[in-house]
Amino acid sequence: MQSYNIAVLAGDGIGPEVMAEAIKVLNRVQEKFGFKLNFNEFFVGGAAIEHCGYPLPAETLKGCDQADAILFGSVGGPKWTNLPPDQQPERGALLPLRKHFKLFCNLRPATLYKGLEKFCPLRADIAAKGFDMVVVRELTGGIYFGQPKGREGDGVQTKAFDTEVYYKYEIERIARAAFEAAMKRNKKVTSVDKANVLQSSILWRETVTEMAKDYPEVTLEHIYIDNATMQLIKSPESFDVLLCSNIFGDIISDEAAMITGSMGMLPSASLNEEGFGLYEPAGGSAPDIAGKGIANPIAQILSAAMMLRYSFNLNEAADAIESAVQKVLASGHRTADLADDSTPVSTAEMGTLITQAI
């Protein structure tokens, strides 16, 4: 029987509550599909500060090193905002984990589920078509990290500058990740750039076009970033996999998230070249609702499904979780963030309903 070790970092706020439901669902699929998941829990973020004095203790990092994947909850809260920036839960835990494991590829799915169209801010006729896309964002290159960057001069002559730098190998590996993701989905990649203006985008487009030759089953199209932001509003159903540089992906992934209508539904994954991944909900720790049993666990549960798909290649089990989520939503069950006139189900009840639907 295939066995996998998972470092479970529930973190702060609603993290422990929603993580418990993800574990519940994972226990169901490992029983149904005949593989073994070993869960090892570690402190991270504010919880780690309280117990160990550091947001990312050495024991936690060691546990992650020994794992096959990291299932991450959420970190942060008002209790720790007065700490020095590098000691705060977000910057002191999540960023070092990304750096340590060389997580260069961010996957952000955005899906509008049947029955949730009214939460979509788009026109009703557009929302009625639904959409199911994933944004593939390069995480370690581009203008956020390029050199030189800085400020110089004074008075009206003060200037600030940043540099957009991409190496061909950086574009190749993120393009490969996008094409591989498309192979598991609807076999279409839309590469986002600004090749009519930027040299970095010209290299981006050339390289992605070359890479496409290795994936003849996948349809490739190129789109300028300004047009991409418009088409996301006009016809989101036309997208499958959106391939983006760091800064363009930062913008596009948030736009795609907002048109779904609920951050509580959105998972994410950050991967390295070996397929090792950190999987987490796209939303935050929501300390205002922590402990009330009303948080939506679906983003955490879908993050677990992504882990099965992208790190372990357990596509059938991942499909089963995603189908169960769709079934439960289609039957009208809602947590408080999505409930209207109906009585909302609790965090634990939603987890149980999804588990039973598998």
Swiss-Prot record:
It catalyses: (2R,3S)-3-isopropylmalate + NAD(+) = 4-methyl-2-oxopentanoate + CO2 + NADH. Mg(2+) binds at residues 226, 250, 254. Pathway: Amino-acid biosynthesis; L-leucine biosynthesis; L-leucine from 3-methyl-2-oxobutanoate: step 3/4. One of its GO terms (biological process) is L-leucine biosynthetic process. The keyword NAD applies. InterPro entries: IsoCit/isopropylmalate_DH_CS, IsoPropMal-DH-like_dom, Isopropylmalate_DH. GO terms for cellular component: cytosol. NCBIfam families: leuB. Belongs to the isocitrate and isopropylmalate dehydrogenases family. LeuB type 1 subfamily. Catalyzes the oxidation of 3-carboxy-2-hydroxy-4-methylpentanoate (3-isopropylmalate) to 3-carboxy-4-methyl-2-oxopentanoate. The product decarboxylates to 4-methyl-2 oxopentanoate. This is 3-isopropylmalate dehydrogenase.
